[in-house]
Amino acid sequence: MSASSVELEKIRNIGIMAHIDAGKTTTTERILLYTGVNRTVGEVHEGAATMDWMEQEKERGITITSAATTCWWKGAKINIIDTPGHVDFTIEVERSLRVLDGAVAVFDGVAGVEPQSETVWRQADKHNVPRLCFVNKMDRMGADFYRCAEMLVSKLSANPVILQLPIGVSESFVGVVDLVKMQAIYWQGDDFGAKFEYREIPADLAEQAALYREKLMEKIAETDDKFMDKYFGGEEISEEEIRAAIRAGTIGYHFVPVLCGSAFKNKGVQPLLDAVVDYLPSPVDTKDIIGENEKGEEINIKPDPKAPFVGLAFKVMNDPYVGSLTFVRIYSGTLNSGDVVINSHGDNKERIGRMLLMHANSREDVKSETAGNIVALAGLKNTSTGDTLCASGKVLTLERISAPDPVIEIAVEPKSTAEQEKMALAVARLCAEDPSLKVASNEETGQTLLRGMGELHLEIILDRLKREFNVNVNVGDPQVAYRETITQSYEIDYTHKKQTGGAGQFARVKMLFEPYDDGEFLFESKITGGAIPKEYIPGVEKGLVSVKNKGLLANYPIIGFKVTLMDGAFHDVDSSVLAFEIAARDAFKEAAKKLGLKIMEPLMRVEIVTPEEYTGTVIGDLNSRRGKIAEMEAKGNARVISGVVPLSRMFGYVNDLRSSTQGRASYSMEFKEYAKMPDHIAAELVDKRVAN
């Protein structure tokens, strides 16, 4: 079946998202097996999974970049984005969800709703993505489907509607009860679960199945008046009517269908595929995308293949065989190989060359794609993640994909000067692929600084420098991205005057500095009556920014302050933009003593799951790291400890936690906020920075 011949109603753009180790990559592998894309099965723990195609992913058994793949099921075209579950890679999840119409949230049947599950769920909420839940690993000891369903309510505030019940638990898990058909589905044999059969519901589950069927029908009735009248009126309701009502409720965000299975044991995946086709939205079921035209007016963009082309570049990556690949979601119109399109963010033209449908690390050439589809474009020169591509003559801009600020940095330098240029090119390529990776230069040492979302994130980047680009680097210890801020308001009237032979320099500025909680930095000019000519005012802001970027206390960037230019004076001959830049810069430095400068540190939200007997040890250790415990709850024989800890005290924590709990505890961590560092610790940090 050719890609472009598929009707819009038959397209499903879905993401598979979950906590690390919940089994989403294995689930995707089974989907590819049953839809005929894979002939053999790749296992994550063997390092052979198709979707995990980067070397680092194969070694670590985690999914790092969203690999896109296309498959077909029952006449529907399914574009799948396999998203990472590690918190260091939330930018991958964020940008994937931005371009998807629906999602499958995979949960570990033993662990239930884990911290990263909450993070990706919040991201899906933010983008209004309808979703299904798949409770995986039902074959594992301790798996509890019903507890998982309860956690969807208590942890995620979801409204689950249960469509299946498990038959058997842990090793005796053999199938599911389908509450829509009211039949049991059994998998057996050594054919990787390809064959299954419908039977009568087992007698010992009949009563429970009837109870949950009633709950299902009542949940649907709450969201559909016609259905309610029929159901409570005792009329017969067909399977098709039930499915249509579940679809409407899912797409309308009224509830979340819940299914179960064991991807690793090849059970429950085909009904999950059926549910993707039956219940998740097509591009025509979602809200229109909003764009802006050149006048700044909002425009509704409909998924019409005959309208002018509009697409969003949601991912740029380097393919070892094809080179640069840009993944684009087509929101409107048709894109053909050979077309010339406009990148509305840089106003550059791009010629469309090879167009590819991707299957993890293999590819299929196509000549044309229409609205609703996801396609990879080879060789675009000037397009980055978040850019809008559109037809020339109809320039529109879509909202960009926002990357979080980095919280950790490392210094890198090439092992030989001959590799300096090679490293710079490699780093530039990696930054184009990954908006959450930032690069800067240490002006004092000349070293390149890589800034990212966590230790694992930067480890992977260093690994890729070596493997993909053959760049060997020396690496410094990880450093926390501290900030400075002001805590007191102060007004300064400062004059910069310099007279040497010939023209001199003159600029006077009167400025008010004050704390500002609503953002990083705000500059405002209240100059009236020509006290300072308009063309000199950008010089004032430039001088302030130069100090802001370098810091005053310990050379960390300054955030959270506002400067108002109140008044000033100029000289007809001696004033210039440069003179006002110097005046503002020196005034800022002069005011420093009065601004109550403080050091800010990144705080991390931490969640630790530990066996009960190590609870005291774990809490004591967190307290010693200046952590604050927010809550603690029981989860079976384990304890879940949530708290907030400074990032500076969390380096190498995974090894300390393993040794103190004999490897039985696990943790996750994500950035929470910047907060003022205690004065005595800040003083030590400042002394150390000044000494160096």
Curated annotation (Swiss-Prot):
It is found in: Cytoplasm. InterPro entries: EF-G-like_DII, EFG_II, EFG_III, EFG_III/V, EFG_IV, EFG_V, EFG_V-like, G_TR_CS. GO terms for molecular function: GTP binding; GTPase activity; translation elongation factor activity. One of its GO terms (cellular component) is cytoplasm. The keyword Nucleotide-binding applies. Belongs to the TRAFAC class translation factor GTPase superfamily. Classic translation factor GTPase family. EF-G/EF-2 subfamily. PANTHER family: RIBOSOME-RELEASING FACTOR 2, MITOCHONDRIAL (PTHR43261:SF1), TRANSLATION ELONGATION FACTOR G-RELATED (PTHR43261). This is Elongation factor G. The gene is fusA.
